[in-house]
A protein has these predicted regions:
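N-terminal extramembrane/targeting module of integral membrane proteins
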Residues: 1-64
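N-terminal membrane-targeting/pre-transmembrane regions
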Residues: 1-29, 108-109, 133-158
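Juxtamembrane boundary at the C-terminal end of a transmembrane helix
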Residues: 157-167
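Short, charged/polar low-complexity linear motifs in solvent-exposed/disordered segments
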Residues: 33, 83, 90, 129-131
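Short charge-dense sequence patches
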Residues: 31-42, 71-84, 153
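Generic secretory/membrane-interface signal
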Residues: 5, 79, 128-131
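Non-transmembrane, membrane-adjacent beta-strand/coil modules in membrane-associated proteins
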Residues: 52, 65-123
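Juxtamembrane amphipathic/hinge helix adjacent to a transmembrane helix
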Residues: 115-142
Length: 167
């Protein structure tokens, strides 16, 4: 069984952007709202970390999408697809000139292929091995450097906020 977690730079970009945008709020809040804004900040951070904890598992028989506690609470269900039920992979363009990919099953169901997971190439080779489908054109939804850049810019924002606060 193989487990594929959300890509580190996807998680880090979302968490660092959340921090960059919300760290100042408790400090600029009026006195009556400081404690509440700190509590909301911590709850929001927990939610972001939890939501980015989804993962995919593969084994000899199937692929499983495992959702985080919060996603399940919001109604998103874990999914399992048998390898033998996957008929083909279909790509659709996005508005950002990228592509999203779907597993199309023998029943005509569409399941979004997770494109933001660690070891994506290994995941694709497992898909190809178990389904016999050509995966050569399947790629990440966006280049990794975009997530790295967003993380870097968010960290610069946090540093700038700390410098402004300390002065």
């Amino acid at each position: 069984m193989e487990k594929f977690k959300t890509l580190f730079f996807v998680k880090s970009s979302l968490i660092s952007l959340y921090l960059a945008l919300t760290i100042p709020i408790p400090f600029i809040s009026i006195d009556k709202l400081k404690i509440i804004s700190m509590i909301v900040f911590v709850i929001g951070l927990y939610l972001i970390i939890n939501i980015t904890s989804d993962y995919v598992e593969t084994c000899n028989n199937k692929i499983s999408y495992k959702n985080s506690f919060i996603c399940k609470t919001l109604g998103r269900k874990n999914l399992e697809i048998s390898w033998k039920d996957i008929k083909l992979i279909k790509s659709l363009p996005t508005s950002q000139d990228s592509k999203v990919y779907y597993f199309i099953t023998n029943k005509g169901e569409n399941f979004l292929i997770p494109q933001r997971i660690e070891n994506f190439e290994k995941f694709l080779s497992i898909v190809s091995k178990n389904t016999g489908i050509d995966i050569n054109d399947t790629t990440y939804i966006s280049p990794i450097w975009t997530y790295q850049l967003l993380t870097f810019i968010s960290l610069l924002m946090i540093i700038g906020e700390l410098i402004a606060f300390l002065n």
